[in-house]
Amino acid sequence: MEPIDPNLEPWNHPGSQPKTACNNCYCKQCCYHCQLCFTKKGLGISYGRRKRKQRRRTSESSQNHQDPVPKQPLSQPGGIETGQKKSKKEVESQTTSDQFA
């Protein structure tokens, strides 16, 4: 075993760092390359910054080109309509007779 130089920092000691640089490969050999590779690749833990997901903003020009929603009459609820409908003449005759009562 080689004697350790007390003047060197622990991360610069011989054998403390692998001979090859870290890479982006996720094979088994590269996952066990060093402790950093193992935590990043093997365990999937990274302590870097998280990128914010940007929201899609609509530009002002695209908002001007939007067509307004046309107003449509409310649809009648479905069902048997024969009993609900009365002729206009019946309704008019009832309203005129109610006015004189």
Curated annotation (Swiss-Prot):
An example Pfam family from this entry, by short name, is Tat
Query: Which residues carry the post-translational modification N6-acetyllysine, per the record?
Result: K28, K51
Q: Which residues cross the membrane?
A: none
Per UniProt, subcellular location reads as:
Host nucleus, Host nucleolus; Host cytoplasm; Secreted
Q: Where is this region: Interaction with human CREBBP?
A: 1-24
Subunit-level organization = Interacts with host CCNT1. Associates with the P-TEFb complex composed at least of Tat, P-TEFb (CDK9 and CCNT1), TAR RNA, RNA Pol II. Recruits the HATs CREBBP, TAF1/TFIID, EP300, PCAF and GCN5L2. Interacts with host KAT5/Tip60; this interaction targets the latter to degradation. Interacts with the host deacetylase SIRT1. Interacts with host capping enzyme RNGTT; this interaction stimulates RNGTT. Binds to host KDR, and to the host integrins ITGAV/ITGB3 and ITGA5/ITGB1. Interacts with host KPNB1/importin beta-1 without previous binding to KPNA1/importin alpha-1. Interacts with EIF2AK2.
Q: Relay the record's extra comment.
A: HIV-1 lineages are divided in three main groups, M (for Major), O (for Outlier), and N (for New, or Non-M, Non-O). The vast majority of strains found worldwide belong to the group M. Group O seems to be endemic to and largely confined to Cameroon and neighboring countries in West Central Africa, where these viruses represent a small minority of HIV-1 strains. The group N is represented by a limited number of isolates from Cameroonian persons. The group M is further subdivided in 9 clades or subtypes (A to D, F to H, J and K).
Family (UniProt): Belongs to the lentiviruses Tat family.
| Name of the molecule in the record | Protein Tat
Task: Say which species the protein is native to.
Answer: Simian immunodeficiency virus (isolate MB66)
